[in-house]
Amino acid sequence: MPAPAATRRDRIEDELGAHNYQPLDVVLARGSGVWLYDTAGRRYLDCLSAYSAVNQGHCHPRILAAMVEQAQRLTLTSRAFRHDQLAPLYEDLARLTGAHKVLPMNSGAEAVETALKAVRKWGYEARGVPAGQAEIIVCANNFHGRTLGIVGFSTDPDARGGYGPFAPGFTVVPFGDFAALQAAVTPRTVAFLVEPIQGEAGVILPPPGYFRQVRKLCSERDIVLILDEIQTGLGRTGAFLAEAHEGIEADVTLIGKALSGGFYPVSAVLSNQAVLGIFQPGQHGSTFGGNPLACAVARAALRVLHDEGMIDNAREQGAYFMQRLRALPGPVREVRGRGLMLALELEPDAGPARAYCERLMARGMLVKDTHGQTLRLSPPLIVTREQIDWACAQLAHVLAHSAPGSSGGPS
């Protein structure tokens, strides 16, 4: 029988909360490093990292200390006034990424919307595209956020169904299909928005050489290449930005999530004078964007990533995790990914991935399913080889006991 407190909590959530999520049936109360703890004190290995927002691990003490210190001094001024934390964040991001202009926002979706506004305005004012005719190319199975503007160019029926009419000006092409991208370009194309690795689609990597072709095309046709690194960036793939694996540089880079280490919503648009210089006072803004608390937290989160070798660890442990995953028994169709952004796709007859997530949860491991048959595996970047070995033991048990023809669920 569920405890009375749990029953009351569930009833309140059901009655008062909007039902736009379907979480696993665990109630978490505490986190530390790679571990999460439920209200009964049971421990779980976090293999989602809040969609890569807690790359540095839960409740990292250095980020927490920076947040508390700044919260005791100054939290919010709005951008109506200057404050002493903004310039240092600009310098840190410029040094780490090579960006010449930085525009801080809050959520990842806000950063995406900001970039879309900037490139449209750039297209009209710098490229001379006729007013109201700018086109932006995006990819099928994309995920860039949940705002009305963004879901308008989603191809996910759940994400876009029932929300129209949508803004015009977006062309959808298959991810990784350079010929399709090339054919979609017109004189009115101002930008190509793309994820280096499609996360929500199931950790889908592009074909080798694809992004070098994309970079060349965008340069030749004066098209702004926007890389959405909100999930792939900040060490997740074993490089500070995933573009490094492709040997290219985007014109606009979007970062967020782990930019705060999970403590606070912080995102940023990184670009150059040509694109971000297009905004004049009053043409774009955000009350909380670039606030003192956000800047202090982001700077600490960036320092922790580098000082503690987390990016190198993601590369090394990611390669080891991939090797172990490929050796797993059971109904595994494919293992793919880069660094610690990994996915295990099940065979079509293996049953829904969510059932495997539920069985893994019962064994102390929290994993998120996506697109029906795929398990996403993205632990914090501090994960150790021993913890990976333990995770693979749980996966092996669940896969072996859940395969078609097996005796049923795990013991």
Swiss-Prot record:
- What are the EC numbers? 2.6.1.13
- InterPro entries reported for this sequence: Aminotrans_3, Aminotrans_3_PPA_site, Class-III_PLP-dep_AT, Orn_aminotrans, Ornith_aminotrans_bact, PyrdxlP-dep_Trfase, PyrdxlP-dep_Trfase_major, PyrdxlP-dep_Trfase_small
Q: Which cofactor does it need?
A: pyridoxal 5'-phosphate
Transcription regulation is among the record's keywords: no
Q: Name the predominant localization.
A: cytoplasm
**Compartments where located:** Cytoplasm
Q: Which residues carry this modification: N6-(pyridoxal phosphate)lysine?
A: K257
Report the PROSITE patterns cross-referenced here: AA_TRANSFER_CLASS_3
Catalysed reactions listed for this entry: a 2-oxocarboxylate + L-ornithine = L-glutamate 5-semialdehyde + an L-alpha-amino acid
The UniProt entry's GO biological process terms, in alphabetical order, are: L-proline biosynthetic process
Can you tell me which family this protein belongs to?
Answer: Belongs to the class-III pyridoxal-phosphate-dependent aminotransferase family. OAT subfamily.
Please give the function described in this protein's UniProt entry. Answer: Catalyzes the interconversion of ornithine to glutamate semialdehyde.
- Its recorded name reads Ornithine aminotransferase
